[in-house]
Each structure stands twice: as C-alpha cells, then as structure tokens.
C-alpha cells in the first residue's frame, strides 16, 4: 500500500503543478506541520475529508485542538471544514436507515461526479517539499516506531504458513498441498506489493507480482475501462495484462474488482462516485442507453456495481455510528485490509480483555459484560468480526484462519498489548486459533461454549483449502437466510433455555438487520465450507498458556456432557466451569460469567506480580 500511495501522490503533484498549484508534502507530527503551514499562508479555513476511522478522526481532533489553543497575528484561529462525496444524495445522515432493506426502498438518487476544479496559482514562495522515496518513507516509519510496535513483524506471515510450519516441526501429518488459487498464495503475491518482482514498462501495476492497480487517476480509469471490457478481448498490451490479473484475483465470483481497485478507491485516486458512474455509463452504452431490469450484461459490470455499493453502504453505517448515538457503548472504526471494522473500548486501567462474539452476533452481544468487567478494573475491548453486525461483509472466502489474522492484527495495531482472549461459539474457536499461532499475544484463553473438538492423540491435522463456492451453496445460503429471518426469535430462545426473556427486541432486531446487509449471503455460504478440523487440544498445546472453559450445560448445539468429559480426559491443564445455561452463557447469565472472568483474570495477573516481587 505504501508504494501505491507514493504513485498516487506523484500523480496528484503533477496534476496540481499543471494548474500552477502544488502539493505540499511533509513528514512528521500532523499538529505541528499543519500549525506551521497555517501560519505561513494565514489560512482562515482548512478543508479535510470526513473520516470514519477512529485513528484518523483522532488526528483531525488533535489538529483542531492545537489550532484552537494557538495564537494568530491576523485574528481568530482557522476553522476546520469537513467535506465528503457520498454516492447517494441524502439530505440528513441521521435520517438514513441502518436497515439496507429499508434504505433501498427510499430510492435515493445517485450523486454524479463533480468536475475537476480550476485552482488559483500558488504564488506564496512556499517550500512544497518532494514526494519521498519508498525507502525514505519506510525509514521514517521505522524511526517513528515505539517499543509497542515491535509486534508488527508478527503480521508478515500468514496464519496458514505458520500452521504448516508448526505441523512440520511437530512431525504431524497434514494435507499440505495447496491449490494455486488459494488466498494464501494471493496474499504471498500481494504482501509488500511492488517491493519484489520485475517492473513492467507502462504497466498498470507496481510489479508483475502485484494485483492492485497503481498510479494516478488516468491510469486507474484506463484500468477500469479495461476491466469492464474483460469479455471483449483486446490487442492493447496493458489491457491484456489487466485481464490476466482479473483471472488471478477472481477467487470468488466478483471478488476481482475489490482486489484490483479497492486500494485506489481507498486512497482517493478515484471516487466511488466516479467508478460507479463510469461503470453504469458503460452498461448503458452496451444497451442503447438503457439499464436492463433483468441484471447487468457482463460479470465485471455486476462485480463493480456490487463492490462499490457494498463499500458505500458500510461507509455510511460507519459514518452514522460516529454522528449518532448508537448502542450502549461508543463505537470506533478500524480499517483492516481495507475493510471497515467496528469495535468498542471501555475502561481506564488494568489488564486488557478482548471479547469475541459467535456466528451471526456482534459486539453488542456482550451488552451486560463490557461495562461490568471494566468497572472491576479492566480495559475491555470488544470487536465485531468482519462479516457480522455492522462491520463490513466483503466478498471474500471466510475461514477460521482469516478471522484469526483479524484478531492478531487488532491486538497488534489497536490494543498494542497482550490480552485475555475471551470468545463464544465460533468466536471461541477463532480465539483458540489466534492463541495457538501467536502465543505472545494472549495472557490467557477463555472459551464460552466454543466450537471445535478434542481429538485424542492427534496425528493428522487437515488444512482446509479455499475453493470456489458453487451455485448450489449460494442457493442454500439464500434459502437458509430466509428461514433464519422468519425463525430468529424462536431459535434464540432455544439457545437461552433458562432465561428466554433475555431474547429481547433489540437483540432480535439487530440480527435481522444484519441479515439484509450486502454480503450477508456470502458469509452464510461459508457455513457450508467451514472445516473446523484443527483440534482444540492441538491449539491448547501450541498456546501453552492458561485456559478456562466456561460451558453452558444446556446448549442445544453441542453435547455439553460429552465435551466436558473429553476436556477432562485429554486436557488436564484446562480449568472448567459448568453453568446452568445454554449456548451463550455470557448473555444468558451475565453476572455469573462476569464474576468467573474477573476471578480468573485476577488469578492470572497475581502470579506475574508475585514473580516480579520475588525477583526484586
């Protein structure tokens, strides 16, 4: 992404210079650089794009605070004005429905792209700086790192690669042959894109190994034109190269658009408006100026429209969460691999705890745990996994390894210290995978009615291979989604056998709301491809740390008695607590679970403190 950013900045600087203007480039603290620039040009207004990410909103807030505390010879401090370019022409964001189904019924008009503005000449004699080289930028980032950033290197190797290495070292057999189109291979190609591989003259890509379109607006729009015309064939060498990349990036039907153009849209090289407008115009040109009511005429047009509208929807949800009070806890947004992820943080001091929900749920499923655990002296983080709740639901292959990398990066980039990992259902299994692959990230592991199984004397651990889903699995997912919407309240009450009143309207409404989100069917498809074949006891052994299992014994999804028996027989170091509850004990009997969790973490935290005291 760094090299793509530099390509975009170079193009922008050239475009501005062609209008006798310029791009000012600086490396350093945003508050200091902006304050210095404001004083040099005596600015009265500062325009900035409206951001949804917590980190970027924090930067803008710090700049605004710095300006408000500054003194300026020409009078009052400058004002910060936020601008945005939404795809839909809405009047009041607070009135926009968070239900995608209801949102579509309003039939909001699409906003058209704005023409490029004519800028006044820059005649201030400023030192505009130069776009740094990739090596200079990497050096700056390296020098800016704090001790907490040393974990960043953990992100360089995929979960699949680590797992394969662990199996090899322990001499455990596995089906280690991977298909050439798996996500792991795609990741290996795109990791550090542009830093390896031969550069191609007049290529739309940073290197022959890159899958992301590089450069400025003209190159990106040319690449989009080539993408839309994928089925037409071409003698243009650069277009042929892009068509080759489409085949590599199409790991799922329609997935290639985001892989190729997602970074360019995220960097603002082209807007979602422009990409959507050009796509629809091409479709109209193919159909005598009309849009067919029966769907789009080519798979690339459909892929582009679906991806752009999906990105826009989750940007709207994220932005609305920042301007409206939603839920019981403050919502923050983190961008992971380009996807928008919701999370919350409560607490001022104490050990860090990360709560991970189960399939179909979201961070609010810990509604009566977060604040109570924080009040008992903990810093509590809760995340909504990609694919669930109001986090983005991209067109990707979902798996336990995919989500484990999400947890790894969240701990490394956001929490920035080891956590007590607490997970329910599939979230528990994902926590176990993360702890098993990256033990240094977890202080302890707590599983609440976790998915996964115990395999005595495991000698073979299969690695699931990503495979393209069939039309049948998609049809099954659509039918299952319809069934779940109609039965969600009844199903949930079966999961809360001792306190069915906990299945209230807010919980049911949020689950139904998420089921209408674009991408929801894709997530449900993963159910038919899930292969939670890595034994829990293998992951426990790999983790080597303290583990607590809290089991609701009336869980209709699992045979709790048999599960507990297997744990006691084959995982002697695991502590077990049985509760009179169902599949989600943390929400069915939150007070009991909160007490168990806090006692557990207190016990874990006391031992290092005692060891430290003895050392002194």
Per-region residue spans from a language model:
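Conserved loop-alpha-helix segment in the C-terminal half of the alpha/beta-hydrolase fold
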Residues: 373, 542-581, 592
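Trp/Phe/Arg-rich N-terminal binding region typifying the photolyase-homology
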Residues: 1-154
